[in-house]
Amino acid sequence: THPSLPNYLAMIGGDTFGVKDDAPSCFASDLSLSQSCHHVEGESLVDQLEDAGLTFALYAETLPAAGDLTLASPPAPAALYAQKHNPFAYFDRIAKNPARLEKLKPLEALTADLSGEAPNLAFIVPNQCHDGHGSLTCKDPVRLARDFDDFLKQTIGAIRASRNWTRDSAIVVTFDEGESRDTPKSPGSHTEDDNRVATIAVTDCGGPAVNDAPLNHYSLLATIEDGFHLRRLRKASGAPTLMNLFDRPCR
């Protein structure tokens, strides 16, 4: 769907929860009294992971500090970090839980975590000049593409070179939304004109493979849940997955 936020909520919550804009979290530290806001009371992927004894962390580029619930950094209109790209900040059970808030970290923390004990699930978000989309301070499409490519090379390279990367590890690169302004259909009614994004899976197992089935962000959540042997949340319950990209023999 459009804009960004509902897609991020779908990735970890299995629903868009009626959200149709990029309004801030009701827990934002710099929320003004006049601003509308969103929050989600229900369960998320974080609850599922921790209930199963697994760990998570968000690594957000240009987030000022761990647990910071600021709307933007630097402040708008020059924002690089944008809260609309951090779905964890919207869930009550995360934003009101100090221990979980500490798992929402600046990207720089990834280096230390890769050298020690990395989380079972790492959710990495580039800033708005490195995500291929751009902002008021970075509009040139050629530079955006180059910077996005450099970000991926550096980040994926660091992960794969770390002690935590094993034959059971995987990286999924995806986007929140495409350029189309059309409202996407359900997977079963997909058309070529719908909102489409590229999604790439990286593992050390098998050769190149393609999944050309119509998928959405519920499919990504379902794939993560199936991979960790978790039950599926909400609209992820009936979603097709990307598992054919991972169910391949390792050398």
Residue ranges and their predicted role:
Residues 1-251:
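N-terminal pro-sequences and low-complexity stem/linker regions of secreted or lumenal proteins
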